Amino acid sequence: MRIRGVTYDVGTPVINGGLTRETLPLDLVEQEMQVIAKELHCNAVRITGQDIERLKLAAGAACRHGLEVWFSPSVHNANEQETFQNMLEAASACEDLRKVGSQVVLVLGCELSVFMSGLIPGDSLLDRLAFLSDPSRWTADMLANGSPEERLNTFLARVATEARRRFAGPLTYASGLWEDIDWRNFDIVGIDAYRDGNNRQEFPGLIRNYTQFGQPVVVTEFGCCTYVGADDLGGMGWMVVNRQSTPWRLGKPLTRDESVQARYLTELLELFDSEGVDGAFVYTFVSPSYPSSIDPRYDLDTASYSLVRTWPAGNDAASQHSPRWERKQAFHAVARHYGKGNHP
């Protein structure tokens, strides 16, 4: 694959109202980008988050370490107008980066049918996911103004048109496998491709089908959690966390197993190579909002997709500016695979 990538979150809203990264010191971002480039052997990073200034900060650090930037604004639960304005602000930021020589791709949203409000009924991501999975709830009234799919494509066409007036670089969208996107509006086909127990057999064919559009295909996101059985859950592995508890805890006993995650990522990277995919971004580098614990009941890293295992922050200022994580088996597995293609 030409693009060897990983996602990097700069702060995304979580269900309890906080952020996945409460602070984002520049020196810490610089350290982590260096690890991504030099140890993980990435040549690209998909930077996600809601705050444009944080995205720009991380993008600058990534560029200084020779990484291609996939700029991915994400304002979860925003309505169409709020999302539209956020994307246009991102387009202007990307053009500023492009003009100083940075390699930048603008990702105009991620799985908006469930992350943006208004297309599918529901006040939250979880509500909309539940609605999406139950066709019996889809009524004629809901489809009166067009299907969610039709309205999503109309929205994306409008956003892409306006974004091109501000940004002269390539555009894509990070689509869910259930979304039927009109890729004529984009330069790159982007898919969030999680293999699970339900799609395991047809998964290679699902990936292959995206090549029909005649554009480069990039897996914008794929990953696996860190416990026995997580490979069968794919993109829903995070649902095992009890978020009603204070602090959060695992909702049931799990057997932590880093080899499950490492094997899953290796298998999919090999599959993407064999199917001629142009690139892929492993989800994700670090997840500070899912810290580990010596008490298995509170080891949230078990339910994270992170390549590194985060430990809780200390009370001293120094701990806020240095990595509090250790490399998992998945980190080394991805580094080995990407390292094989690490050539000019």
Pin down the residues of each PLM region:
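Glycoside hydrolase catalytic-domain groove-lining segments
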Residues: R165, P170-L250, T266-L269, D273, ...
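Short, acidic/polar
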Residues: N16-I36, T83-C94, A174-D182, A262-L269
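A solvent-exposed, charged loop/short amphipathic helix patch at secondary-structure junctions
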Residues: G122-S147, D232-T255, A303-P312
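Active-site-adjacent substrate/metal-binding segments within catalytic domains
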Residues: M1-L57
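Active-site groove signature of glycoside hydrolases
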Residues: N43, A91-E149, T172-W178, D278-F281
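Aromatic-lined substrate-binding rim segments of carbohydrate-active enzymes
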Residues: E32-L88, A144-T172, P296-L300
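Aromatic-rich peripheral "rim/lid" segments of glycoside hydrolase catalytic domains that contact
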Residues: T7, G18, F281-P344
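Hydrophobic faces of well-ordered beta-strands that scaffold small-molecule active sites
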Residues: R2-Y8, N43-I47, V69-P73, V104-L108, ...
